[in-house]
UniProtKB/Swiss-Prot annotation:
It is an enzyme of class 5 (isomerase). It comes from the Bacteria. GO terms for cellular component: cytoplasm. It is found in: Cytoplasm. This is L-fucose isomerase. The keyword Isomerase applies. It comes from Escherichia coli O6:H1 (strain CFT073 / ATCC 700928 / UPEC).
């Protein structure tokens, strides 16, 4: 089967078409702008899979309808998923713009005095607004000389932010969400909304009963040699935590081995269901070898599976991590309890950063007063206003231990192409595997337990669906916090101490939902959230605007909010603009 190609970025150099001196004097400068833009994007960006981003430049500068059509024909054949139009001069607005209604698009008008690039930018954006095809504006803050081929820092920031978000849009389009099971314990996010995936993300939903997973395990529809490799890897790397079950529920060595074996098999089979596995065709399972073209998945687990079979904690944690028995590799996106909306937030974060995502319950707000009462410890530093306990038995990526290091030696989570085997081993060494608590998981299983290092910048996100409004996105930038060990132990033992923990302190603004830490917790729209490494809320905002998903809560500086230019026509308050524009334009893939 032919492999689906990755989306490319189309670069459209547009030009004043008047011959006999005007166009000729601009050809080189205009095409050089396109080449410089392509070089920047190719150097600075990668796809989430690690592949280099490719740019496709129009064969000629575009002065009118004929050349615009020729450019579009080329882009259509090259799988261009987003476009950037560049020009240093006046051109003919509506005659030269990209008219594809679903492809994200931006225009960079060169800020120079010799030719009016800004005038074209304004004229072209007016045409986009009038035609109902929003576009992003890129215009340098400072005037440049005509022969200056450099890309200013503010222009570079917008080019990269637009491209990251646009690539995420293009990468999701045409893929599927694998809904493995149904609704878990009444959790609304696991009531998978096909219309949301189709209309806003351009994706399909593949609904598969959990009996398909059982069938693959029981009928050995997997690579048996790989299973042996996985078991050997676990034997070498897994450290086991204490068994907190009552004696009558504790398993012997043989039973524990069977639970581990099935947990690893679940990881293999869910992966194969998502992306396919050619080795299955070798054993006569051609249909199963294809997979479901899934860019994200969710596993219901509770309770119809977990009451009799090992839970999905081990499988989900391994799949979401950037490494397994095959070494360092691209992380998958698998939502525990089939919370598809948290899965979408995970997918967004992964596409924007290329990193693994930390799925968690937004479990408890601990005020400074409560912590001092319970532990005698007075919070300070990042934690001085209180903290939120993020903890869940399921699919937190082991990368979330933050045992990887950036170029300055700081704890972080990195895209897989930057992770060394030593860093992967360090994440494994920081993780214990604790037998599942029988009262919750009668079929057994192992939950990963680690503690996220402190002082690491994170962005917490969540997608919710509101009847009558549609999807909304929540964003909270903040940091992980490290507590003294005795304080952590006291707090952690008040909940389930066999699960992974991140202590999170959101950045406060003193206003609205970010008045204090309690308000962040109180305004969070569901029981789950996602941690993405870095303060990348601005990228989420740009991506959400492309998909027409309003942001109902964020603490990103206003100067970093970057949305299509037409949003400015929807009022003077930028968050009200967002709601009105998203309602006006409707979902990106209107269905």
């Amino acid at each position: 089967m032919k492999k689906i190609s990755l989306p490319k970025i189309g670069i459209r150099p547009v030009i004043d078409g008047r011959r006999m001196g005007v166009r000729e004097s601009l050809e080189e400068q205009t095409m050089n702008m396109a080449k410089a833009t392509a070089a920047l994007l190719t150097e600075k960006l990668r796809h989430a899979c690690g592949a280099t981003v490719e740019c496709v430049i129009s064969d000629t500068c575009i002065a009118g309808m004929a050349e615009a059509a020729a450019c579009e024909e080329k882009f259509s054949s090259q799988n261009v998923g987003l476009t950037i139009t560049v020009t240093p001069c006046w051109c003919y607005g509506s005659e030269t713009i990209d008219m594809d209604p679903t492809r994200p698009k931006a225009i960079w008008g060169f800020n120079g005095t010799e030719r009016p690039g800004a005038v074209y930018l304004a004229a072209a954006l007016a045409a986009h607004s009038q035609k109902g095809i929003p576009a992003f504006s890129i215009y340098g803050h400072d005037v440049q000389d005509a022969d200056d081929t450099s890309i200013p820092a503010d222009v570079e920031e917008k080019l990269l932010r637009f491209a990251r978000a646009g690539l995420a849009v293009a990468s999701m389009k045409g893929k599927s969400y694998l809904s493995l099971g149904g609704v878990s314990m009444g959790i609304a996010g696991s009531i998978v909304d096909h219309n949301f995936f189709e209309s806003w993300l351009g994706m399909k939903v593949q609904a598969v009963d959990m009996t398909e997973l059982r069938r693959r395990i029981d009928q050995k529809i997997y690579d048996e040699a790989e299973l042996e490799m996985a078991l050997a890897w676990a034997d070498k790397n897994f450290r086991y935590g204490e068994d907190e079950n009552n004696k009558q529920y504790q398993r012997n060595a043989e039973q524990s081995r069977a639970v581990l074996r099935e947990s690893l098999l679940m990881a293999m089979c869910i992966r194969d269901m998502m992306q396919g596995n050619s080795k299955l065709a070798d054993i006569g399972r051609v249909e199963e070898s294809l997979g479901y073209n899934a860019i994200a998945a969710g596993f219901q687990g509770q309770r119809h599976w977990t009451d009799q079979y090992p839970n999905g904690d081990t499988a989900e944690a391994i799949l979401n991590s950037s490494f397994d028995w095959n070494g360092v590799r691209k992380p998958f996106v698998v939502a525990t309890e089939n919370d598809s909306l948290n899965g979408v937030a995970m997918l967004m974060g992964h596409q924007l950063t290329g990193t693994a995502q930390v799925f968690a319950d937004v479990r408890t707000y601990w005020s400074p007063e409560a912590i001092e009462r319970v532990t005698g410890h007075k919070l300070d530093g990042l934690a001085e206003h209180g903290i939120i306990h993020l903890i869940n038995s399921g699919s937190a990526a082991l990368d979330g231990s933050c045992k990887q290091r950036d170029s300055e030696g700081n704890p972080t989570m990195k895209p897989h192409w930057e992770i060394s085997q030593q860093e992967a081993d360090a994440c494994l060494a920081a993780t214990e595997w604790c037998p599942a608590i029988h009262e919750y998981f009668r079929g057994g299983g192992y939950s990963s337990r680690f503690l996220t290092e402190g002082g690491v910048p994170f962005t917490m996100t969540r997608v919710n669906i509101i009847k009558g409004l549609g999807p909304v996105l929540q964003i909270a930038e903040g940091w992980s916090v490290e507590l003294p060990k005795d304080v952590h132990d006291i707090l952690n033992k008040r909940t389930n101490s066999t699960w992974p923990t991140t202590w999170f302190a959101p950045r406060l603004t003193g206003k609205g939902p970010f008045t204090d830490v309690y308000s962040v917790m109180a305004n969070w729209g569901a029981n789950h959230g996602v941690l993405t490494i870095g303060h990348v809320g601005a990228d989420f905002i740009t991506l959400a605007s492309m998909l027409r998903i309003p942001v109902c809560m964020h603490n990103v500086e206003e100067t970093k909010v970057y949305r299509p230019s037409a949003w400015a026509a929807h009022g003077m308050d930028i968050e009200g603009q967002d709601y009105r524009a998203c309602q006006n334009y409707g979902p990106l893939y209107k269905r």
